[in-house]
Amino acid sequence: PIAGSMVLAAILLKLGGYGIIRMMQIFPTTKTDLFLPFIVLALWGAILANLTCLQQTDLKSLIAYSSISHMGLVVAAIIIQTPWGLSGAMALMIAHGFTSSALFCLANTTYERTHTRILILTRGFHNILPMTTTWWLMTNLMNIAIPPSMNFTGELLIMSALFNWCPATIIMLGLSMLITASYSLHMFLSTQMGPTLLNSQTEPMHSREHLLITLHLAPLLMISLKPELVI
């Protein structure tokens, strides 16, 4: 069910990150070198999840693996226990909660009209539902973390914190973000561009669907313009 996916991606996955933040407070901040294997594992897991996204043909699975890859960055930032790392982790968790939930919502609107989640069968929606294409573009840009979005603020803080802790981590972080941009572009082009493969009549997006996406993106834009609200 799409509601379960939205709650899982937006709230439950982030509760795990919040739990790690609370648990890490019992460890001394001077001994973060001991956690090097876990940081490497988190960043490597983020890269593997991103690579899995690139080969996905199922739209919903692609968005789910995207959430996992972002949580890898969050876990790595939390473990080093620096103020910038914790601020970046909180910012990215909140921003990606809105983004991934909006992506699941958009995937459901596509599924209700095509009755399939296979990427190659959902193309051509920019000809039929141009406003939906606009929502897809905005949400994918947030997923890529373009400035001045909250996603960008979170990833920039995480990159800075990890680079100060160990400069070698920039290689894994850069690779992860490059693959994120690749699969986000692939997802947008696969669902919106190209010729329409539907033979049946497609109903337009309802007002409630536009309202639902607006309720995801409006708070995200608000905290992007005023990050002091959350970090």
From Swiss-Prot:
Class of enzymatic activity (EC top level): translocase
One of the GO biological process terms: electron transport coupled proton transport
Top-rank lineage group of the source organism: Eukaryota
EC number from the UniProt entry: 7.1.1.2
Membrane-protein topology: Multi-pass membrane protein
Catalytic activity: a ubiquinone + NADH + 5 H(+)(in) = a ubiquinol + NAD(+) + 4 H(+)(out)
Gene Ontology terms: cellular component: mitochondrial membrane
Major location category of this protein: mitochondrion
Membrane-spanning segments: 1-21, 34-54, 63-85, 89-111, 128-148, 156-176
Subcellular location: Mitochondrion membrane
A molecular function (GO) term: ubiquinone binding
Entry annotated with the keyword Metal-binding: no
Keywords: Electron transport, Membrane, Mitochondrion, NAD, Respiratory chain, Translocase, Transmembrane, Transmembrane helix, Transport, Ubiquinone
Its job: Core subunit of the mitochondrial membrane respiratory chain NADH dehydrogenase (Complex I) that is believed to belong to the minimal assembly required for catalysis. Complex I functions in the transfer of electrons from NADH to the respiratory chain. The immediate electron acceptor for the enzyme is believed to be ubiquinone.
Family that this chain belongs to: Belongs to the complex I subunit 4 family.
Protein name: NADH-ubiquinone oxidoreductase chain 4
Organism: Crotalus concolor
